């Protein structure tokens, strides 16, 4: 038997036997003891109980127990010498106290070998399970995995020989800091490796993923001509020489002349800057590259500079050509040391490309921006964008031409007078006028009309300038009456004040955020505003508040005049601090919005005093006018309550029909303006209200007569 050979080998090698004993004891003692019947963990197995006694009693008990074990081991050896292995087996298995004794275990194994029952003994299976558990517990420290085959014969029938030794590995205990540092290094190396692979993949996939080479394609079919661009004749004249250069470059280069490399179009939004660039390409018949400043940057660093290089590289292959960059301030803003490096890279690449290609390559760079002051100085210097062309809002004639261009695409009625619409739309850009025509066409289509009429254009203009009507808003009669007198006060002061803008329309229909509105439009385009016009605007702003006080009393004034007071205060402060229209402050400009840093306390108080004086004077002027023309105020308010909306022409007809000596009243206004009336007290307001009530009947009768006489005074939608 294999176990018999093991015992023989162990007997000849006492040193190996001692190691095996310690191993077997550890493995065997970690499991329940073998009972008399050979069952593990049976009822016959019991562990020695540890009693917590004094140190003296404990040491005495241990000495007694050790002496008994020595005697029992000696008895087992005696039985072996007597050749009675069965008695040794019975004694060992019946006494659990011997299971932890190495000498007793050795005698027990000898007895099993003699009776040839070692392979069938419960001890073998218990040792195999115990050694496997110990090996799992000690694997971290080089454990006992080599002893998992205990009880199984090897090639030579023994656990190990000189030719087939049992290999064991012993490792030193590692410290926590070393283990942590090793983990961090592993994670760091992995992160760097993944980042490098990702960067390599992105770098190779940027061109395909973002489609740089596919996007840089010129537009060869630009059908826009200079004749399609209206209202910017001066800008077109400056761009014509670029067209001639693109058509015949040798005409300019033969004398050594050099055209600008870059043209910067500056102006408000919607004035036709992009259309001008397309017209250049259409007139010259050359390829046209179009892009936006925001298209260069992406989430990847360096993409902007690469796109700039690809754009100019494609342009060089198609020269002569035009590159148009819209909203160039997105990449051409002034550089700041705090900006990100990738933002500077794009601008630097743009600067190099603008000043890097040869002069005669036939590439014209046209850019557009609404904020030329925000561009970097290196970008707009001579040699790059060295020509600036201003594209302003069109004047009256330009607006008429633009309206004609857009109206040629819709069905127009015979009563349409585009010059009237052009005069009534100061400050409108080409895009605003195109929107006006489109809104009018949609209105005519909704109404089922065959063509676009003048009323449709007026509706579109009022909707853009005054906001959409809110006819469904529920407003009380008291609020409508107060709004009518408020707007009537504005209109009357504007009519009877020299220098005020003509009244275009008055309405008490809510539009936008306002309950009512008086619209004023100039007869012609204004390039500057005089002091008389500004003072007239202050008077008109005060007209609504004064009308409320005269009709309803100071205790009944509302918050409806808050916007008027805000506009008047801003205008009066600008007159004092910006326009030098105050004798006390002088011809000095002050920055009033810097919390007083640019002025002393005395100067600030002086400015406030001058502003208050201007507003009080405007208040007195408005009060004088409305007191004199109180009858007209009632008539106008009643007409607004009846028709809700009146045009400037209808208001003038209403006032003309009133039986009043206008020349005499104007003379009285001039006389009373020389002696301003102070702000009224509640008693004076009451008397004014009484006087107004006395004239109410006559005014109402006159308004009714005028409404009957002029049937054309229908509400203007």
UniProtKB/Swiss-Prot annotation:
It is a single-pass membrane protein. In the N-terminal section; belongs to the AAA ATPase family. Zn(2+) binds at residues 486, 490, 564. Binds 1 zinc ion per subunit. Homooligomer. The complex formed by FTSH4 does not contain FTSH11. The chain crosses the membrane at residues 181-201. Induction: By high light. Probable ATP-dependent zinc metallopeptidase. Involved in the assembly and/or stability of the complex V of the mitochondrial oxidative phosphorylation system. Its EC number is 3.4.24.-. Its cofactor is Zn(2+). One of its GO terms (molecular function) is ATP-dependent peptidase activity. ATP binds at residues 267-274. Its main location: mitochondrion. Residues 1-53 form a transit peptide. The active site is at residue 487. This is ATP-dependent zinc metalloprotease FTSH 4, mitochondrial. GO terms for biological process: meristem maintenance; proteolysis.
